[in-house]
């Protein structure tokens, strides 16, 4: 709805469709094939969440809550975000990218122009009682 006024606007996020990771490239291609459009940030988070759960279910019995929690904490899956881990309070540790709105053919999308924060965890993790 914003149209051309959005071009050049910069924003930050932990994901972008142009991240050069095998899992992300495959995810974006499959999503475009299935839905005819570029996936959103929220779609990538949902995909990562499903793969996190599947990775934990592959190594731990879901009825054993402690074992399953440990398997989730290991986060042993190929994320669309690249390297992925959880901090001590279960927030992700991840890069935060600077993106810019551009035209790609006839669609508006974001492209990475830099990294704002590397391996960033929750700023308040030290205050968490977990």
Predicted regions and their residues:
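Extracytosolic ligand-binding ectodomains
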Residues: 1-130
């Amino acid at each position: 709805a914003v149209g051309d006024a959005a071009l050049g606007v910069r924003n930050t996020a932990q994901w972008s469709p142009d991240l050069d990771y095998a899992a992300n490239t495959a995810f974006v291609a499959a999503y475009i094939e299935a839905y005819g459009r570029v996936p959103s940030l929220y779609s990538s988070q949902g995909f990562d969440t499903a793969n996190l759960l599947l990775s934990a279910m592959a190594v731990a019995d879901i009825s054993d809550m402690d074992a399953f929690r440990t398997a989730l904490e290991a986060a042993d899956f190929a994320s669309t975000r690249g390297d992925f881990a959880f901090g001590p309070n279960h927030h992700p540790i991840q890069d935060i990218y600077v993106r810019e709105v551009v035209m790609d053919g006839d669609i508006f999308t974001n492209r990475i122009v830099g990294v704002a924060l590397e391996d960033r965890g929750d700023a308040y993790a030290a205050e968490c009682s977990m």
